[in-house]
Regions:
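Active-site-proximal substrate-binding groove within the catalytic cores of carbohydrate-active enzymes
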Residues: 171-400
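Short amphipathic alpha-helical segments with coiled-coil-like heptad repeat character
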Residues: 11-15, 283-285, 374, 441-446
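A cross-taxa feature marking solvent-exposed loop/turn segments within ectodomains of secreted
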Residues: 33, 346, 359, 440-441
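Conserved structural scaffold segments of CAZyme catalytic domains across common CAZy folds
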Residues: 1-107, 113, 120, 280-282, ...
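Non-catalytic C-terminal accessory domains or segments of carbohydrate-active enzymes
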Residues: 370, 375-377, 383-447
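Aromatic- and carboxylate-enriched substrate-binding clefts and catalytic-loop regions
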Residues: 37-258, 265
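Solvent-exposed loop and beta-edge segments used for protein-protein assembly and interaction
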Residues: 77, 142-144, 189, 197, ...
């Protein structure tokens, strides 16, 4: 799934109107590029952090002010647009007492106000497992949602650890108990229902049920540039080996609005996410985005089907990150390289084609995607002058000595999404090909 999410874009201003306005905007401007999902995050029954929840609003009773027509109405409207409705859930706790808790007080393991709730269930309690959890999970489908984001996993494990001796079955570890809950949810929803775990504050929250979830949030909320560098980039380097091998690693929303980013920073965030083929979740109020930032979204959609080359945790230099994507097609193989300046000052970076990109010694055509500039035929290395927090994304293609493509404009992969056939006919001296493009989107072939 790729598309808009409420929390990062509008936070506690999320409501039916905001969701449907962004869904309609996404349908008109981004759906043809690959944005196919709308995520309703936790505001549907939460109104603030660290407070006792309002009476009458809980998992089974969405906020009637924010969603006056109910969640089924919202999901249906999203689906009418041809988009996938997705829902945030936190079924291991409740923000306020409700009928189930009042009738089954022994199902509550801890009553303690946390960011997401106050009543935390005993994961091993039979009534929780056999009554509350199935009812909560079934509601997702009853309301018409086709994907979910299961949050509150770290704090659930925290309280399960702290109050472990009071569990109905303390012989189970906290991870085993939570895994059983996830396993039951998966059985109810089926194998084809997309489930995203959230969030990965530590390794165990990502790994305890990696085989049961389809995707995993691998870090905390990312808004400003420092959070992007210290959490987003760092967590990707640590967990990328799992991406598209065991799970889809989700490093958090792509937030590019001017409130949190210069244009260079917005380009850098978009580039790093896209070149690595990570999930694209949009974290801005879409109608408010300036046109040049909407353009960034068009060039990173759809998410690439990329797999890691490394089987272990990666590292990077303190002043830069180089993300190297190899694209292999029947007609050509080339590299797309994101060079990210981590410094808030100018930075000269030299990329060694053999040492950094693992390319054979030879001549290569190098094209700068964002600056729309051909950097020439390169041997050995290429040196870049990067502005503070800026990125350059390069297409690096083996020099063939005949007319050939150096880049295309549709996608940051510079042919990975759009090029379907390419061939040079020596007899006629013609370069021929077939591209899949988006209607109304200007398309350039750079050769």
């Amino acid at each position: 799934p790729a598309g808009w999410m409420t929390w990062y874009a509008v936070k506690f201003d999320a409501c039916e109107k905001a969701v449907l306005e962004n869904a309609a905007w996404q349908k008109e401007h981004l759906a043809d590029f690959g944005a196919n999902t709308i995520w309703v995050d936790w505001e549907w029954y939460h109104s603030a952090f660290d407070i006792h929840g309002p009476e009458g609003i809980d998992y089974f009773h969405p906020d009637p002010v924010r969603y006056p027509h109910g969640l089924r109405y919202v999901a249906d409207k999203i689906r009418e647009l041809g988009l996938i409705p997705a829902l945030w859930i936190g079924p291991t706790n409740e923000p306020a007492s409700n009928q189930f808790i009042e009738e089954n007080p022994d199902t509550v393991l801890a009553k303690q106000v946390a960011w997401c709730g106050e009543y935390f269930f005993d994961l091993t309690n039979e009534k929780f497992l056999n009554e509350y959890l199935p009812a909560a999970v079934k509601k997702v489908k009853e309301w018409g949602f086709e994907a979910l984001k299961w949050d509150c996993l770290p704090v659930t494990l925290l309280f399960a650890d702290q109050y472990h001796e009071y569990m109905a079955h303390p012989e189970l570890t906290s991870e085993q108990a939570l895994r059983e809950a996830v396993k039951r949810a998966r059985a109810l929803l089926g194998e084809d229902f997309y489930m995203l775990s959230c969030a990965g504050a530590a390794d165990r929250e990502i790994l305890f049920a990696i085989d049961l979830f389809d995707g995993a949030r691998i870090g905390g909320d990312i808004f400003n540039w420092r959070e992007f560098i210290n959490d987003f980039v760092a967590r990707v380097m640590r967990f990328y080996a799992y991406h598209n091998t065991e799970t889809y690693c989700d490093p958090d929303n792509l937030v590019i609005r001017p409130e949190f980013n210069s244009l260079d920073q917005a380009v850098s965030r978009t580039s790093f996410l896209s070149v690595l083929g990570l999930p694209v979740t949009l974290g801005d109020n879409l109608p408010d985005l300036p046109p040049e930032r909407v353009e960034l979204l068009k060039r990173c959609l759809p998410a690439l089907d990329a797999h890691p080359m490394d089987i272990r945790e990666s590292h990077h230099e303190s002043d830069r990150v180089i993300a190297n994507l190899t694209i292999s097609r029947s007609f050509e193989q080339w590299n797309v390289v994101d060079v990210l300046n981590l410094l808030e000052q100018d930075n000269r970076v030299t990329v060694d084609l053999e040492a950094d990109l693992h390319l054979k010694k030879g001549r290569y055509l190098v094209y700068d995607f964002w600056n729309k500039e051909f950097l020439g035929v390169v041997e050995g290395s290429v040196t870049l002058e990067l502005r503070p927090c800026a990125s350059q994304v390069l297409a690096v293609r083996p020099y063939q000595g005949v007319p050939q493509i150096v880049s295309t404009s549709r996608h940051i992969s510079q042919g990975g999404v759009d090029l379907k056939e390419v061939a040079y006919e020596a007899k006629t001296r013609l370069l021929k090909g077939v591209s899949a493009v988006v209607a109304g989107d200007p398309y350039e072939i750079r050769a």
